Amino acid sequence: MSAAAYMDFVAAQCLVSISNRAAVPEHGGAPEAERLRLPEREVTKEHGDPGDTWKDYCTLVTIAKSLLDLNKYRPIQTPSVCSDSLESPDEDIGSDSDVTTESGSSPSHSPEERQDSGSAPSPLSLLHSGVASKGKHASEKRHKCPYSGCGKVYGKSSHLKAHYRVHTGERPFPCTWPDCLKKFSRSDELTRHYRTHTGEKQFRCPLCEKRFMRSDHLTKHARRHTVFHPSMIKRSKKALACPL
């Protein structure tokens, strides 16, 4: 027997021996590998005849191949699950998979959660987020003018009421200055008009000494200064509202 054949013979003997120890019958039934086990006396006997040695070698190799084929079809045992790891019915009811929004879609995760999970957002989730943002933007301006042919929409009902007076011609804010019969549809228009009688100019330029009756006139003037910034007017308004 050559060296390579002898090594195969020894490996086959080891494989058969391991299979005989591992194949413990369950429920009293002998597995198929038990039927293919070679008797101990045939494995351990001295091989004086070369023909017998070659025969035993071929038998062991055949059994080893059969055992390898059986291992391919051996069912994988599922690991036992402890009772502590089972989810309770309450946890199952409160899982995220059962929660749906009013539109019928699953709640979207925050960008931090998507970044931690390492998965890119799906196109469907991006579509839902886009629809939600559009719906939020539309809800900000939900007061539509009911007048025929006018499609203007406002975020506040008071702004809509003031605009609707343009269609009806209503002017509920009359000027109280003596001999002045003007009326206005908005209170801010009346306030600006009233300053024409009093000469009040409460809007002062923060970069010079000029004053104006209207804030838009002040802004238009202040932009002519090279060092002007819109925050300057905001600070001047706060100082005027809260004098020291």
From Swiss-Prot:
Family matches, as PROSITE patterns: ZINC_FINGER_C2H2_1, ZINC_FINGER_C2H2_2
SMART domains: ZnF_C2H2
Localization per record: Nucleus
GO terms, molecular function: DNA binding; DNA-binding transcription activator activity, RNA polymerase II-specific; DNA-binding transcription factor activity; RNA polymerase II transcription regulatory region sequence-specific DNA binding; zinc ion binding
GO CC terms, sorted: nucleus
Region of interest (Disordered), residue spans: 26-51, 79-143
Composition-biased stretches (Basic residues): 134-143
Compositional bias per record (Basic and acidic residues), positions renumbered to this chain: 32-51
C2H2-type zinc-finger residues: 143-167, 173-197, 203-225
Phosphoserine: modified positions: S122
GO terms classed as biological process: cellular response to cortisol stimulus; embryo implantation; negative regulation of keratinocyte proliferation; positive regulation of transcription by RNA polymerase II; progesterone receptor signaling pathway; regulation of DNA-templated transcription; rhythmic process
InterPro entries: Znf_C2H2_sf (IPR036236), Znf_C2H2_type (IPR013087)
Keyword vocabulary terms for this entry: Biological rhythms, DNA-binding, Metal-binding, Nucleus, Phosphoprotein, Repeat, Transcription, Transcription regulation, Zinc, Zinc-finger
Pfam families, per the entry: zf-C2H2
Subunit structure: Interacts with ZZEF1.
Family: Belongs to the Sp1 C2H2-type zinc-finger protein family.
Function text: Transcription factor that binds to GC box promoter elements. Selectively activates mRNA synthesis from genes containing tandem repeats of GC boxes but represses genes with a single GC box. Acts as an epidermal circadian transcription factor regulating keratinocyte proliferation.
Name of the protein this chain belongs to: Krueppel-like factor 9
Species for this entry: Mus musculus
